[in-house]
Design a protein with these regions (language model features):
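Active-site beta-strand/loop microenvironment that shapes enzyme catalytic pockets
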Residues: 45-68
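Reductase modules of NAD(P)H-dependent flavoproteins
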Residues: 1-40, 69, 73-182
Length: 182
């Protein structure tokens, strides 16, 4: 579980992140319910997957990647963005181990605050446009998980610019473009 405390412009904490960071005792049990996103389930075959996300969205992508590694499916590409590598590279040892063992064929990281000019996941998509096209041509399924504000729309636009609007619409219709954004 990855939790980052969120607040609105007035400083009001987010309902879930505020409760978890301010009221839930560390290592205590809490009652919760899991709400399934029916459109974000993992495919049941060995087609390549491209996982794109930022922040706490990595948790959703990690569940997909864990399932694929258990089945020895290695055509996995993770494009992940956060603020600072030193503080925000969640699951770093697991991700690096997957890369070393070949379970993660590609890894592109975008740490927006580690350099003067901010770099986000949509920039990484654009940098890797030819690879993206090749993976999609080989049947890749694209999963996007994370911020609805900013990241999700920027990724949408990058995909449209790289692949075309018609191609992205076709991916959606075929169930090859799946999102869990919040």
């Amino acid at each position: 579980l990855v939790v980052r405390q969120q607040s609105d412009a007035q400083g009001q904490l987010g309902l879930g992140s505020g409760w978890l960071t301010q009221h839930a005792a560390l290592n205590s049990q809490i009652a919760l319910r899991i709400r399934t996103n029916e459109s974000f389930h993992l495919i049941n075959d060995n087609r390549p997957v491209i996982c794109i996300g930022n922040g706490t969205g990595l948790a959703g992508l990690m569940s997909l990647l864990h399932a694929r590694t258990r089945q020895d499916y290695t055509q996995n590409w993770l494009i992940f963005g956060e603020r600072q590598r030193e503080h925000d590279f969640f699951y770093q040892s697991t991700i690096e181990a997957w890369q070393t063992t070949g379970m993660l064929q590609r890894l592109d990281l975008a740490f927006s605050r580690d350099q003067e000019e901010k770099v986000y996941v949509h920039h990484k998509l654009r940098e890797q446009a030819q690879q993206l096209k090749a993976w999609v041509d080989h049947g890749a399924v694209i999963y996007v998980c994370g911020s609805i504000n900013g990241m999700a729309s920027d990724v949408d636009q990058a995909l449209i610019d790289i692949l075309s609007e018609a191609a992205v619409d076709q991916l959606r219709q075929e169930g090859r473009y799946r999102r869990d954004v919040y």
